[in-house]
Amino acid sequence: MSAPQPHDLLWGMTPAALPVDAPAWATQVLAAGQPVVVRRACCAAGWVAVGLRGEGRAQRLGVQMRLADIRRQLRPEALRGQGTSPWAALQALASVAPVLDACGLAWGPTGGVGYQLATGVEVLHAASDLDLLLRTPRPMSRAKARELLDSLDCSPCRIDVQLQTPAGGIALREWAGVAQRVLLKSALGARLVADPWNLLECAA
């Protein structure tokens, strides 16, 4: 099993591992055997920062999970939509798949779409966005980012793509824009950088 990365889904955390003041819904989620999602935060050795997802945006909880408790790990790129769906977000996933596959980079759905595909739990609704992760180990030009964004903006719902660089995550929409610096999110927090692939700048 590889080291957990942001947006990976992990199974194996139990209600007993929750803080004593955790809400009842969080206990129910873990008791039902649902996964947690890896988030960006620093942890002590042997632990990983994760988030629990309940019903609606109000039910979110950030906690830590022991690496030794992980029983299953699923990355976004392992998830793909199957068949037709009444939800615009899943329709969008099917429509953009050929465009993203043509990039030659690893990618996959995150957020509600990824969670529903992985668990079968119905969390999507008519206004759901499609969140995607695109792994970009090497720099993507801003012209290429604009081209990709243009090809995705004709989908039936809003699509938010995060580019995962070696230093952290940035929004495709920002990288395709005109601002000289963009917001890079990492385990150390968020900061504005000019080159999100420059590890020295991102660590400064």
UniProtKB/Swiss-Prot annotation:
The active site is at D129, D131. InterPro entries: Holo-ACP_synthase, MdcG_C, MdcG_N. It is an enzyme of class 2 (transferase). It holds the Pfam family MdcG. The keyword Glycoprotein does not apply. GO terms for molecular function: nucleotidyltransferase activity. Its EC number is 2.7.7.66. It catalyses: apo-[malonate decarboxylase ACP] + 2'-(5''-triphospho-alpha-D-ribosyl)-3'-dephospho-CoA = holo-[malonate decarboxylase ACP] + diphosphate. The keyword Secreted does not apply. Keywords: Nucleotidyltransferase, Transferase. HAMAP family: Malonate_MdcG (MF_00650). Transfers 2'-(5-triphosphoribosyl)-3'-dephosphocoenzyme-A to the apo-[acyl-carrier-protein] of the malonate decarboxylase to yield holo-[acyl-carrier-protein]. Belongs to the MdcG family. NCBIfam families: malonate_mdcG, PRK01293.1. This is Phosphoribosyl-dephospho-CoA transferase. It comes from Pseudomonas putida (strain W619). The lineage of its organism: Bacteria, Pseudomonadati, Pseudomonadota, Gammaproteobacteria, Pseudomonadales. The gene is mdcG.
